[in-house]
């Protein structure tokens, strides 16, 4: 019973980690593209667009908009950090 729930949570957590790793790889590729095309790392309009869409989708799924705001802001901040670090190394 409880063990089964915990195993299910562990499985979900592993999928989340895999998706975050994949997202960071794509973010680094975006950083390379931006550097090649002399673009700013932070594209505030894109972030706001993505965040608004995520919050709306979260609400429709019964997930707290505030929670999603914090999670996606943290993911975005890490993506920016990785883009900067990765392009500085090249």
Language-model features, listed with the residues they occupy:
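Domain-level signature for soluble enzymes in the chorismate/prephenate branch of the shikimate pathway
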Residues: 1-90
